[in-house]
Amino acid sequence: MLFEQIAANKRKTVFIILGFFIFVLMVGAAIGIIVWNNYLNGLILAAAIGAVYILIMVMSSSSVVMAMNHAKEVTSKEQAPVLWDTVESMAMVAGIPMPKVYIVEDPSPNAFATGISPEKGAVAVTRGLLNKLERYELEGVIAHEISHIRNYDIRLSTIAIALVAVIAILSDLAMRLIFWGSLTGGRNSRKSDNNNGGGAQIIIYVVALIFVILAPIIATAIQFALSRNREYLADASAVELTRNPDGLIQALQKISGDTKKMEEVSASSESIYFSSPLKSKKDKPGLFDSHPPISSRIERLENM
């Protein structure tokens, strides 16, 4: 059952990522039709902006993420021996280099991982997590975060965030080009083209315009669907490492029972946390939820 869940989640992720890339190209094609009456120009624009933006995002240092979330590095075992030993042992079981270790001085129990590859991985936990969890529960949470690093989830989520940003940039650019085109006579040219092409040309133009306007909303929903799926995968992978689903279940129950929101959370970092730092209590995931409900995660773990 465990390995079936892992395989199913990996397949689902592949489909989501492929769909995401196709969606970006579709947005580019729609912009090409709207602005230049040529979808190929839009495809080239989308591919170029996407490639550059993804490269910039992927090359960004994990230290930037840590700084945004006020995380302080643990540089020696003596500073946090239990945390250090847990991260070291889980990394060894996972077969990856030991990630850098950080602590966020926040009373709300939570954790996150960053780093685009296992060689550049880093794990951060809040002070509240260290104070609230027993060691076997901490192992479950750390195994979850180590799984994110081993499964290249941070790289995937970085690409997804970049693609959402690219779509937002393209959509905004299209609106500006349409506006300036209308001021400089582009509208008259478009009307002439529509007269030559008939009603079909008008319909294509309107559909493309609506698609471009809605694209950022759809892209954000896809990004969060990917995030929720990777949380399920990391839970299953954590059990693969610890062979003890109860530790992760108990940790989730304790975190769910804690009502304190994190005091300082970077909005752009919300999706990377172990559980939603905003303490959502939903029983069913919404389209724009970065995490599945904790009750749903526990149910899946109990069925392994």
Swiss-Prot record:
Pfam family, one: Peptidase_M48
Membrane topology category: Multi-pass membrane protein
Gene Ontology terms describing biological process: proteolysis
Residues that coordinate or bind Zn(2+): H144, H148, E231
Sequence segments annotated as region (Disordered): 275-304
Entries under InterPro entries matching the protein: HtpX_protease, Pept_M48_protease_HtpX, Peptidase_M48
Coiled-coil regions listed in the entry: none
GO molecular function, one term: metalloendopeptidase activity
Compartments, as annotated in UniProt: Cell membrane
GO cellular component: plasma membrane
Keyword list, A-Z: Cell membrane, Hydrolase, Membrane, Metal-binding, Metalloprotease, Protease, Transmembrane, Transmembrane helix, Zinc
Textual note on the cofactor: Binds 1 zinc ion per subunit.
CDD domains: M48B_Htpx_like
Protein name listed in UniProt: Protease HtpX homolog
Species in which this protein is naturally found: Listeria innocua serovar 6a (strain ATCC BAA-680 / CLIP 11262)
Gene from which the chain derives: htpX
